[in-house]
Amino acid sequence: MGHAAALAFAREGAKVIATDLNPTALQSLITTTGISCKTLDVLNDEAVNHFVESAGAVDILFNCAGYVHQGTILECAVKDWDFSFNLNVRSMYILTRAMLPKMIANGGGVILNMASVLGARKAAPNRLAYAASKAAVEGFTRALAIDHVKQNIRVNCVCPGTVDTPSLGDRISAFADPVQARKDFVNRQPMGRLAAAEEIAESFVFLVSDESSFMTGQSIFVDGGMSL
């Protein structure tokens, strides 16, 4: 969804710096007007700090890196738990902590975090580490929002339902019966279909724009009714 977000922000006239651990994932964005691309490992604190120092003034920070671990607690080794929280939560902490002073010095800004419908509001089988980490993102979002609201910093998170992304495609392909697996993902959506990444990206645009200027500390569910 980071790809769709970068394109949506650029269409609105933003100067976007898109980052990814895998430079190949950035190739399709390189020629897009308004987007520059940087390879970044958000689990490397030194690399994150160097990136923030080189980024210049920033008005919007979108924390989007994430990983979906599948399994129950008995199928979730400590290393799986730690990796899920490191990528899904700690990376947000490190990048936000490095970027926030620049935003405050610049008079304010907007931080948007990627959460999930699976988290504080809803559970699903075999998603222990993922759901727990995404619930933590919601808590992080609210705590950050209340701490810095007086400094003109707005912080919200988006909680999508099941989105048709390359990541989902990879997970579906790993099932013994990928066709049935896709049907199962569709069937858990009350609307009877998966979301397009571009649909979710429209909510990103709203939440970082002046149209949402009176919103902070909110979890916005764009889930096709999955949380009902």
Where are these regions (language model features)?
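Canonical Rossmann dinucleotide-binding motif of NAD(H)/NADP(H)-dependent dehydrogenases/reductases
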Residues: 1-15
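Substrate-binding pocket helix/loop in short-chain dehydrogenase/reductase
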Residues: 72-73, 80-85, 185
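C-terminal substrate-recognition "lid" of short-chain dehydrogenase/reductases
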Residues: 93, 193-222, 227
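Active-site helix of classical SDR
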Residues: 96, 133, 141
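Alpha-helical segment proximal to the catalytic Tyr-Lys
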Residues: 101, 146-150, 213
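Residue(s) in the substrate-gating loop at a strand-loop-helix junction
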Residues: 116
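Short, flexible catalytic-loop segment of classical short-chain dehydrogenase/reductase
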Residues: 160-170
